[in-house]
Amino acid sequence: FGLEPGGDSDSAGNKSFVQRVPVQTAPSGATWNVIGILRGTDPREAIMLSAHLDHLGVNDAAPGDDKIFNGADDDASGSVAVLELARALGPGKRPRRTIYFVCFGSEERRGLGSKHFIDNPPVPLTQIVADLQFEMLGRPDPKVAAGTLWLTGFERSNLGPELARQGAALVADPHPEQRFFQRSDNFPLALRGVIAHTISSFGLHADYHRVSDDVSKIDFPFMTRSLNSLVKPVRWLANSNFRPAWLSGQAPVRPSR
């Protein structure tokens, strides 16, 4: 796709696409993020397109013969969105802003991957003007118009309305009671000042965190149409002087314990 690696360097200084994330708690071991960079002409600003690449693995205690949690919608659909946007945006003229394409590990384990990324970013977080996280957009949500995606925290910043004006099939999250803005990898970034939201079409289907979240249930024509609506708006965001901002009183704050 013409991307530069943005992960760890080896002893010879060669960059990898993989950013390893140490895991200090059980189950021990390691997870990782994957980072690709489409270098822009202005090194002072960047945008980020992200998803999480993990799911729940295998559960031997699950009822029935199928013990594998495939996670087709949650969140293989988001990882595919990041890859397809990289495919669409990579060729041709370089954008003004650098675009970071990031897939986080271990979102399902307390967001370990995104938290490590925040503590070890490939670029200062102050230079990331926006992050769009993609999560569960493999099926249409019956609560919104056909072919439409929704944005968590739509009312919090000027980013969602502006992307919609630029042609994105994007509306406000129809499930505010679910608090999805706080439940995805966008939230740790938002707490650090990045204008970060999640794009989704999750209609609260019954396959959430079940072994039945299978690729056979993905609506590929819907994914294709809805993601295609984002290509020009994201390209515009990468080339414009528009800088997203939280609206008055809407910047997220860390929950009190």
Annotate the PLM regions.
Residues F1, W32-V102, H116, P122:
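Catalytic-core environment of secreted peptidases
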Residues F1-D8, E84-R94, D119-V123, A164-A168, ...:
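Sec-exported extracytoplasmic/periplasmic mature domains
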Residues F1-G2, G13, F17, V34, ...:
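Stable alpha-helical elements in mature extracytoplasmic
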Residues F1-L38:
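A non-catalytic alpha/beta surface segment that caps or lines the substrate-entry region
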Residues Q19-T25, N33-V34, P63-D75, G90, ...:
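Second-shell loop/turn segments in exported
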Residues R44, R94, F104-T198, F202-D207, ...:
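Metal-dependent peptidase/peptidase-like ectodomains
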Residues R87, P91, A206-R257:
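His/Asp/Glu-rich mid-to-C-terminal helical/loop segments that flank catalytic regions of hydrolases
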Residues P95-S106, D131-L137, R243-S256:
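Acidic/histidine-enriched alpha-helical segments
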